[in-house]
């Protein structure tokens, strides 16, 4: 795991309550038009509608019922604002505020740290990636945050969610690899996990949500699916397509398999993909 913890930590939610509160106009129709244009009309309308309709509800529910909080990444535009329904001035991107990992107690070391953002005590809107003119953080404030182990970006997103899980007494199992989906009468009812060389069965009442990252470190899947070579992945090295493989084994339908979040990269000599050395320039 660790894809989200290594990331910039932003979530994309059209018509979210924070942009509405800031006076930024958006609508269900604009968001659906944007998604339809981006997908070249290949998107499943019912899935797009569910995402657009329930995304703002998700943000409100988390903030009202847990300690998770979000804030606008001011002026961060949609990735393709030139498409119909796109927002060139931003508003749809949210991030979690800084969080002290001391709040997680003995659990804080269970959150993996990547080399993209590390444990940097800054938010996206305070970085050059999140703003053309980032909010300046004084050296004194930066030191205070570091001493309090305050983290931003993907660490903040996972930190907020993890803290909420701990407060709700939700059990989190780490170092446990999902290896097989259990099906009964055409429905997924559980998952087999492997922990410490032992296979355990976890049954699900409502279903199984797969959040297993990508498959960019699986050379066979990259060769079979992507539209071009990927020579230098810059993500968690354990992203080997476990969820995808499990789905294919039970005959799940696949779609949009040729694309990735492409970016130019130059692999640094001696890189081991574990964050000990920079992996791209």
Feature names for model-found ranges:
Residues 44-49, 234:
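Active-site rim elements
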């Amino acid at each position: 795991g660790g894809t989200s913890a290594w990331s910039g930590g932003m979530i994309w939610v059209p018509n979210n309550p924070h942009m509405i509160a800031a006076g930024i106009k958006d609508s269900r129709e604009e968001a659906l038009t944007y998604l339809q244009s981006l997908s070249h009309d290949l998107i499943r309308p019912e899935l797009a509608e569910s995402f657009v309709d329930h995304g703002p509800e998700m943000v409100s529910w988390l903030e009202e019922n847990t300690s998770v909080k979000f804030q606008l990444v001011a002026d961060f535009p949609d990735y393709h604002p030139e498409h119909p329904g796109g927002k060139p001035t931003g508003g749809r991107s949210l991030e979690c505020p800084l969080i002290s990992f001391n709040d997680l107690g003995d659990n804080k070391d269970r959150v993996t740290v990547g080399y993209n953002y590390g444990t940097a005590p800054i938010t996206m809107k305070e970085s050059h990636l999140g703003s053309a003119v980032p909010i300046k953080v004084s050296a004194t404030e930066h030191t205070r945050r570091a001493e309090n182990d305050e983290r931003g970006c993907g660490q903040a997103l996972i930190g907020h969610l993890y803290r909420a899980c701990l407060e709700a007494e939700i059990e989190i199992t780490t170092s446990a690899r999902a290896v097989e989906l259990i099906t009964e009468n055409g429905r997924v009812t559980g998952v087999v996990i492997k922990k410490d060389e032992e296979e355990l069965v976890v049954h699900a009442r409502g279903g199984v949500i797969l959040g297993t990252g990508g498959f960019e470190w699986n050379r066979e899947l990259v060769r079979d699916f992507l539209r071009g070579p990927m020579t230098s992945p810059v993500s968690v090295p354990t992203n080997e397509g476990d969820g995808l493989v499990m789905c294919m084994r039970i005959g799940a339908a696949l779609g949009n398999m040729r694309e990735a979040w492409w970016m130019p990269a130059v692999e640094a000599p001696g890189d081991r993909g574990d964050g000990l050395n920079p992996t791209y320039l």
